[in-house]
Amino acid sequence: MASTDPMTRRFAVACGVLSQYVKANSSQPSTAAPVAQGVSGLMAAAAAAAAAPVVQEPGCEVDGGGQQFTIFYAGKVVVIDRCTPAMAAELMRFASAAQGGGGAPEAPPALVDMPIARKASLKRFLAKRKATPASARSSYVVRAAAAEEEQPPAKKAKAAVERREDWLALGSLGHMHSR
């Protein structure tokens, strides 16, 4: 369980200190960081974290001029707090030396979950979905037209009148409402 990554180690130490602080101050009200009575758990944890003592790794310089340094590399984000300008320059020199010695640049890894791929997939799906109801509707229309064509001309007119009367009868229901 021992991790050699300094960022992971720093995070674990900070979580341990925060846990100890919360346990120590859970029975008594805090005077260092007053918290309102109606504050939710997240706000209380944020207030406790603000009042927690700062834990430093051995070998870290305490410099008031240090700023946060963020590195984006290989799909990961690394954030270094209190980075001095000298340390940032050294990191940039190291990165440029590592980049220059490689020869031909490597192709970035293919990302499976790209928004463009999802957009194209959705477009294909919707195209298939649109085609399905249209073909289903057209097949019903063709069948109905074929059934009408099979009837003799005299029966077609009679069937049309019957269909009209059926719709009128369904809509009015006159005999039920005449009371």
From Swiss-Prot:
* Alphabetized PROSITE patterns for the sequence: TIFY (PS51320)
Give its localization.
Answer: Nucleus
What is one Gene Ontology biological process annotated in the Swiss-Prot or TrEMBL record?
response to wounding
Per the entry, what induces it? By jasmonate, wounding, and cold, drought and salt stresses. Down-regulated by abscisic acid (ABA).
Coarse class of the primary localization is nucleus
Transmembrane portions of the chain: none
Q: Is Methyltransferase among the key words of this record?
A: no
Q: Which UniProt keywords apply?
A: Jasmonic acid signaling pathway, Nucleus, Stress response, Transcription, Transcription regulation, Ubl conjugation
KW Disulfide bond (keyword) present? no
> Which ranges belong to the motif Nuclear localization signal?
117-124
Q: Which residues form the Tify domain?
A: 62-97
The record's section on InterPro entries has: CCT_CS, TIFY/JAZ, Tify_dom
Q: Which Pfam families does UniProt cross-reference here? A: Jas_motif, tify
Alphabetical GO CC annotations of the entry are: nucleus
Motif Jas, per the record, lies over 115-140
Reproduce the UniProt comment on modification after translation: Ubiquitinated. Targeted for degradation by the SCF(COI1) E3 ubiquitin ligase-proteasome pathway during jasmonate signaling.
Supply the domain comment.
The jas domain (115-140) is required for interaction with COI1.
* Family under the similarity heading: Belongs to the TIFY/JAZ family.
What does this gene product do?
Repressor of jasmonate (JA) responses. Forms a ternary complex with RSS3 and BHLH94 to negatively regulate JA-responsive genes. Acts as a positive regulator of tolerance to salt stress. Involved in salt tolerance by modulating potassium homeostasis through JA signaling and regulation of the expression of potassium ion transporter genes. Acts as a transcriptional regulator targeted by the SCF(COI1) E3 ubiquitin ligase complexes in the JA signaling pathway, and interacts with BHLH062 that may directly regulate the ion transporter genes.
* Miscellaneous comment in the UniProt entry for this protein: Plants over-expressing TIFY11A/JAZ9 display increased tolerance to salt and dehydration stresses. Plants silencing TIFY11A/JAZ9 exhibit decreased tolerance to salt stress. Plants over-expressing TIFY11A/JAZ9 display decreased tolerance to cold stress.
Quaternary state and interactors: Interacts with BHLH148. Interacts with COI1A in a coronatine-dependent manner. Interacts with COI1B in a coronatine-dependent manner. Coronatine is an analog of jasmonoyl isoleucine (JA-Ile). Interacts with RSS3. Forms a ternary complex with RSS3 and BHLH094 in the nucleus. Interacts with BHLH062 and NINJA1. Interacts with MYB30.
* Protein name per UniProt: Protein TIFY 11a
Q: Which organism is it from?
A: Oryza sativa subsp. japonica
